[in-house]
Amino acid sequence: MIKPTFLRRVAIAALLSGSCFSAAAAPPAPPVSYGVEEDVFHPVRAKQGMVASVDATATQVGVDILKEGGNAVDAAVAVGYALAVTHPQAGNLGGGGFMLIRSKNGNTTAIDFREMAPAKATRDMFLDDQGNPDSKKSLTSHLASGTPGTVAGFSLALDKYGTMPLNKVVQPAFKLARDGFIVNDALADDLKTYGSEVLPNHENSKAIFWKEGEPLKKGDTLVQANLAKSLEMIAENGPDEFYKGTIAEQIAQEMQKNGGLITKEDLAAYKAVERTPISGDYRGYQVYSMPPPSSGGIHIVQILNILENFDMKKYGFGSADAMQIMAEAEKYAYADRSEYLGDPDFVKVPWQALTNKAYAKSIADQIDINKAKPSSEIRPGKLAPYESNQTTHYSVVDKDGNAVAVTYTLNTTFGTGIVAGESGILLNNQMDDFSAKPGVPNVYGLVGGDANAVGPNKRPLSSMSPTIVVKDGKTWLVTGSPGGSRIITTVLQMVVNSINCGMNVAEATNAPRFHHQWLPDELRVEKGFSPDTLKLLEAKGQKVALKEAMGSTQSIMVGPDGELYGASDPRSVDDLTAGY
């Protein structure tokens, strides 16, 4: 749901941004305005700690944990569990995602808790009798669910990098589920718009989110007694309760009764994985993001590397020339995504080649500022030898400078719409993120290849891109977004707006966005760009499509004195950045 003031705000942002795109070969990046003087858009400010999330109640849970002495990881896990209660559209126990952690001493690590295909999954399981993808199977059936990873990921993070016990950080979520909370605008709207398509088809789901034959409305109280019991068991017995105990039994029985594939053995075998983040240097800043099976980190760094080959400062924010260069760079990156990206435990992902600056230069040499290249003429690049809206994001920074960026999901809104037995837990439809048939797009229009084909115990490719930017050796920007295929370009523009433009975090958040993903061959834009600019882009050969808002960033910027500046996205309602 888009805030009524959003379009007016992005229009102002576009006018105020001025000339701000720049590249490494250009003069130094402009100094950052942290939003304390003449800027129109002002971030939230705090001294000790800050949380930015899509839900105000969950944000407050995180702030309370920080106030009680918890670190950023403690708060991040508490927020994640709270969102599973208050933002069931995407917050979850039955899904998965990624967490990026940067400690106060500068160590940065990535935790992969992406869902896994069950052991009985087969390559062609989502094809019909004619050999074509069947979206009902991959989106709304019990076959659509991968083995969930959220509980394992949160436990790995808490055990290794947190300071509080599990029962402490789960307690706020348990109370919210047991006692209930007031349904806000965002949840009411999504229940009506998206929930109506999947939730009423399943009695367990309908019993939770429906009242007298209608979806819950704003102002109603949502009590989730069964979810409270599951949270209580996890708090008392740890992740084994989810993967080997009563909850595992409920999930396995739900699958067995309804033709799903997840078994108790799949759940018992699931492990979250700690990985080395993807990193790159851009104009004196270090950018850290998720490695595969996320494609986000690789392609954010790849596109930034391409942009370094252009002196973009003279073009200005939102100009046709600047947008042309970025859109063309995005086409090449998404073409590579379709060919090379997959689960690194199963396929060799050429991440070093894709993030190589020489490779970026070879792409930049093919970009014509005056003429768009049709997507049909763009093919995945020839690489050097191997060396390898329905989501939610939140960011946390604590008083010591520890930072956490988390993006996790059920895939589409409310996932399959299936609640597993009496667990109160909604299940994901993440299997749709595999390439059911190479060359055929998924629900987000993304095209994949053999590297992302369905396979047993494999993790599907993702666009989720929790990102941390470092300046002068210190955490500077913590950001991320939902948005399916548009996550990568949304996060990219937050980084570019902040570094190249000197925008404060609120300005960078409010600025209008655009997106090109190679296929379909269209340049998707939000309202807020000049009509003349869009006409110029069309004259260059871009197929401009004016569509709804993109992304919902939740970001925190750290000033040179350690003061925190945060912003929640005006494209969402009921989100909140808060600190103390």
Predicted regions and their residues:
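Alpha-helical support elements that line or immediately flank enzyme active sites
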Residues: I65-L66, A152-K160, N237-K244, E249, ...
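Extended C-terminal subregions enriched in glycine
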Residues: K458, N500-E548
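Gram-negative bacterial Sec-dependent N-terminal signal peptides
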Residues: I2-A24
